Amino acid sequence: MVVGSGQESLLRAPDSPTDQAARRLARALALPHRPISDPHSPDRQLQLLQASGEGWLASLPLDPGQALPDGSTWAEALGAWCQPTLVILGAQQLSSGAAASSTALLRQWRVPLLGLVQWGGSWKGDLRRRDGLPWLGRLEEGAAEGSDATSDLVGLLRQRWTLLDLPVPS
């Protein structure tokens, strides 16, 4: 699952960074990109996704910590379903604490966190390493398919899947 952090309007926007990243990574991993047709029903959506019987990537159009009408959250469901999750954060979010709060939220619910990916902006590896969060790297807006950065990120994603003792999607 690929998730973002922040306002619903930014996550649901056509071609949101979360959706673009999920589609690009799905292509690079040779996985289908699956839609979330009803974001207010996480257990049902995860059940449908799991029933496909194959690997997939989906982009969540809500912040995983956002309370749903029944009081649940996607973070809670992702943890209950042991769903490996990748967090996409826009470069403009890096100074806001969104990376740390997203990491803490997902860890609280025991979500298998694959890592964090910066969307756009310039990569400051020293700062990312200093914050101690599980950063995997950066994806550039509009980068060509098969770019070195995407290939490197896919390699790191596969390593994280292995480190978390999860089946690596093929």
Regions found by a protein language model. Give the residues of each.
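Generic detector of well-ordered alpha-helical segments enriched in charged/polar residues
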Residues: 23, 46, 151-158
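Loop/turn-to-beta-strand initiation segments
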Residues: 52-58
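C-terminal-of-GTPase-core extension/linker across diverse P-loop GTPases
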Residues: 155-170
